[in-house]
Amino acid sequence: MPISQKNQNFIDRTFSIIANILLRIIPTTSGEKEAFAYYINGMSAQSEGNYAEALQNYYQAMHLEMDPYDRSYILYNIGIIHTSNGEHSKALEYYCRAIERNPFLPQAFNNMAVICHYRGEQAIQQGDSEIAEAWFDQAAEYWKQARTLTPGNYIEAQNWLTITWRSK
């Protein structure tokens, strides 16, 4: 096993142990603890590439979790899975739902921008420059929002915004 994979496994195990300890000591309701357990199980399955299992856990967590901020991260992770599966429309829907609950989620804005940029590239390949420009404009708006929330991050996005005259 490569060293980086060993490190990742160690980090995943350490995170799981710490999460279980926190579940026991932090004063929360049993529903909140159960929601968090499903969320952790979802993250574990997702990191192993078991997307169907991860989605089941995330949906259970969504059913139990009432806090909008915590729900935003569940929705965000569901979006990541749909992105990984090439289900971009579903991914965009989940990223939007995450942002509705937590407008300070730059990674969701970034992922939405990446999908829009990808769709713009697809439109160019299909010879539809007007649709491509609309997708690129939308990508630019999402990247601007991500960069506003985390100045100094998403440097490649900033470079793209600059060279395409979309930075303002």
Curated annotation (Swiss-Prot):
Which positions does the entry assign to TPR repeats? Answer: 35-68, 72-105, 120-153
Extract the InterPro entries matched here: PSI_Ycf3_assembly, TPR-like_helical_dom_sf, TPR_rpt, Ycf3/AcsC/BcsC/TPR_MFPF
Query: Which cellular component terms (GO) are annotated to the entry?
Result: plastid membrane; thylakoid membrane
**How does the protein's chain sit in the membrane according to the entry?**
Peripheral membrane protein
Please name the PROSITE patterns in this protein's record. Answer: TPR, TPR_REGION
Q: What is its main location?
A: plastid
What processes does the entry annotate via GO biological process terms?
photosynthesis
Which domain of life, per UniProt? Eukaryota
What the entry lists under Gene3D superfamilies is as follows: Tetratricopeptide repeat domain (1.25.40.10)
Give a Pfam family name: TPR_12
SMART domains per the UniProt record, alphabetical:
TPR
Q: Which UniProt keywords apply?
A: Membrane, Photosynthesis, Plastid, Repeat, TPR repeat
Where does the protein end up? Plastid membrane
Q: What does this protein do?
A: Essential for the assembly of the photosystem I (PSI) complex. May act as a chaperone-like factor to guide the assembly of the PSI subunits.
Which NCBIfam families would you find in this protein's record?
A: PRK02603.1
> Member of which family?
Belongs to the Ycf3 family.
- Name listed for the protein in its UniProt record: Photosystem I assembly protein Ycf3
Q: Which organism is it from?
A: Cuscuta gronovii
